[in-house]
Amino acid sequence: MLHRSHEPTSNTPYDMVCVIHLRAAKTFSFNTAFLKTAHLFQSVVQQVAVQLQYICFMRYIQVTIKDIARELGISPSTVSRALKDHPDISPETKKAVNALAEKLNYQPNIVALSLRQSKTNTIGVIIPEIVHFFFSTVISGIEDVAYSAGYNVILAQSNESLQREKTDIKALFNSRVDGMLMSISRETTNFDHIEAILSKGVPIVFFDRVHNSPQSSKVIVDDFEGAKEATLHLIEQGCKRIAHLEGPPNLVISKQRLEGYKTALNQHKMPIHPELIVSCPSGTIEEGKEATEKLMALKNPPDGIFSTNDPAAMGAMQAIKEKGLKIPKDIAVAGFSNWFFSSLMDPPLTTVDQPGFEMGQEAARLLIRHIEMKDKDNAELTSETKILKTRLIVRASSLKKK
């Protein structure tokens, strides 16, 4: 029988395993050979544990060039040149260095590299909502250009919150991004947080929802012309009282679309009725539905609706159907943005198409050009504004005349 004095008291994993085996021996009568076997087992477990600890340490602790050099018995400069495939380093040394680097999961220290080069080859992107179909197409365009040019992309979303936007822009700045692409939230009316970053020399290119700063470039669509064309189409279809579901009043895109709507009415000498302009600050389906219910409750309801976006237009169509009215016979509807569901609605929604992918590409090209100009000595940055054309897609929701 084994005595308690023979049991290890340590709480390490390998000692605990041995305790289990040693205690098991108390239940049975084993000879001295078992005791020797148990202690041998403990020794093996100790060795395995040490190896596991080393592997875990090397896996989760940042491996450096010095670690590789120490293991191979060569200088850190030789390791550095081998990793860069320098011609002065022998193929055998390169092979050994790269094999060990892969085994130890070596990754270059991006922070140290960026401090030496004053560049991270990283672009920060801030959007209001990633679930927004238009913004998802913009992101695709940004990544298409950025990755081709050797830049990584860090994406942040404000969720339409000014406070989140402030947090995001600060986090991207602290991450030492080379520049930022940004579309402001609907809550953003004060731009001090943006001006603070611009004053530090970080290039920012705005897209879609923009801040009119002389220090920054922007890529937008012609919201005015797109809205005017959609409203003119409703007029051509015979609409006499056209309502407008207005977007967030602080956003330039909302103002431009409202002006396009008004200009189309003025061109046809049609009066602008304030009661036919209803605010939808969030631009949601629910807001569009509620706004349309109010419009249909008017003594003289509209026979056409131009919505600031497609979700609100979808809500308008729901309200019209629930009222027992026909689209477009009783009320014609047109939206803006050409969301993916627009063509699937019943009837399919007439809408203004925004080239989101192209906008993302142009914004990324502009920013990369600014970054590279900034890297050149005495290069003076000049702000640019790129305006992309919209396209009216006519579908059944607005075709009163067939």
What are these regions (language model features)?
Residues 20-23, 28-119:
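N-terminal helix-turn-helix DNA-binding module of bacterial transcription factors
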Residues 163-176, 287-301:
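Short, well-structured alpha-helical segments in soluble
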Residues 166-182, 188-225:
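Short beta-strand-centered segments that line the small-molecule binding cleft or hinge
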